[in-house]
Amino acid sequence: RLRKPSTGGAGRRSTEKYLFAGIVPAGRMYDLCREDLRINFHTMRTGIFYGSTTGMTESLAAKIAARTGVAQTDVHNVADASADEAEGYDLLLLGSSTWGCGELQDDWYDFLDALKRKALSGKRVALFGCGDSASYPDSFCDALAEIRDGLEATGCTFVGALDAAEYDGCTSRICRDGKVIGLAVDDGASEAVSDARMEKWITAVGF
């Protein structure tokens, strides 16, 4: 007798049980796997950590939180936050503006130094930030590259890369292997362009 797979959010193991039992039609396999991923993703706890000097990255962090449903209590200014707080999250959205020749926002230095000492295996990390590609094309949003490179050895998984075609002529360190490593909001771009990029980034992160 055929049994129907559970729709109660039992997770990946329930789907695998029915797949291996041979009772789920082949055409349903992809949809069921996607459903499991969606259920698992939306049970993940998300934290936003940002560094902001002029308020632009703070505003961007608030906009991302509103768009993704992240609670205000889970939005942290790294000037006041502890890296220990990051350990309580499954998905970290990390944001910084870029200063000087591709440098981090000031409050990020101590926070990143502490964060890169944490074991972040199993956590997902997505990057966002603000910059000016017209004035600083070779270091546009390079603070994101600083964060990524600093966390490479922590065991985290980076998500949220965008197609480099979104940023025509990108020459900074955020452009790698045909991808841009995160959401780079350009001071010179229109609000419509920035919003469209944010939507693509949110989708790439997995929301």
Residue positions per predicted region:
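FMN-binding flavodoxin-like domain, especially the glycine-rich phosphate-binding loop
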Residues: 59, 67, 71-76, 88-207
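Residue-identity detector for glycine
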Residues: 8-11, 22, 27
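Short acidic loop-to-helix transition motifs that present clustered carboxylates
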Residues: 77-82
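Polybasic, lysine-rich low-complexity intrinsically disordered segments
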Residues: 4, 17-18, 29
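N-terminal beta1-alpha1 ligand-phosphate binding loop
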Residues: 45-64
